Amino acid sequence: MDRGRAPAFADQSALSLLLTGPRYEVIPAQGIEQKVAVLPYGATVTVTASPSLGLERTLDVSVALAARGYRVVPHLAARMVSSRGHLERLLQRLDGTDIREVFVIGGDADPPAGDYRDAGDLLEELAGLSHPFAHVGIGGYPEGHPLISDEALLEALRRKQPFATQLVTQLCFDADAVARWVRLLRDQGIQLPVVVGLPGVVDRRRLAEISLKAGVGASLSYLRKHGRQIVTLARSRRYDPTGLATEVARYAADPGSGIRGVHLFTFNNVEPTRDWVARSVGGPVSPAS
């Protein structure tokens, strides 16, 4: 399928369903509150955690956006949490807010700030604390990880499954890989609902650069496997996710797939991504009032 071509009617219906209530991931850089303001009231916004900005910045932005009526999901990076006391203070920041979901990841801090080396460590600590979260997301790698074996990734998911309510995948360009991975999870007894991580409408060159830096993109094996896609990404101005999202929507149309939506990596290009979602589901293209 041509990734820029409008989907057929049946595919359009599946795509509209998949894109109903998407998650918009943003980076808590300066000015992000103004960029998010174009989203409709109540939209789900996830706020990343970066060693360069700190978890406190993640929570500052999360609290501010929640106060504006968004459904906010802060990322908690285990390797950025220095101690149980630090974790308790972070949770206290959310007291009095409507934030009821977190996304727990290992993170990129090297060395780690404390004793939490991966998401499993932090999830186990969270389970022993009083916290307000009705939903806890964890990450998944449909195309594998350059530094972790597939078996180790599966074992980590088995460890984390009791503490989580859903899986959110790493940025992915291969719908078939997502489908194979979901089937593998089910065969291995991992039954968490899956939210598929897709690129939003972003600058192709920037997307290519970030794809090489983030997660699986750092490995030579990834470059060998996806080099053609990376070159293609860099050739024109903006990436259109319609084709990829439509392919994912076909798999998601099977209720047994367990695919429950999409997590859109906006890289802070919120407005064009929002406009694409609105066009795809047939809704109005208008900012929040």
Question: Residue spans of the language-model regions?
Answer:
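Glycine- and other small-residue-rich loops at beta-strand/loop junctions that grip anionic moieties
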Residues: Y24-E25, S50, R79, P146-S149, ...
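Conserved, mostly hydrophobic/aromatic
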Residues: P74, K160-F163, V196, V248, ...
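Active-site glycine- and acidic-residue-rich loops that bind
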Residues: V81-G85, D110-D118, T169-V182, R204, ...
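Catalytic cores of alpha/beta
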Residues: R84-R93, E151-L157, R180-R186, D203-S211, ...
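Active-site pocket-lining/capping segments in soluble small-molecule metabolic enzymes
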Residues: Y24-P28, D115-Y141, Q191-A253, N268, ...
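Active-site glycine-rich loop that binds ribose-phosphate moieties when present
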Residues: L147-L167, A177
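Charge-patterned, long linear interaction tracts outside catalytic cores
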Residues: K160, I259-D275
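Active-site beta->alpha loop and helix N-cap motifs at the rims of alpha/beta catalytic domains
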Residues: D2-L154
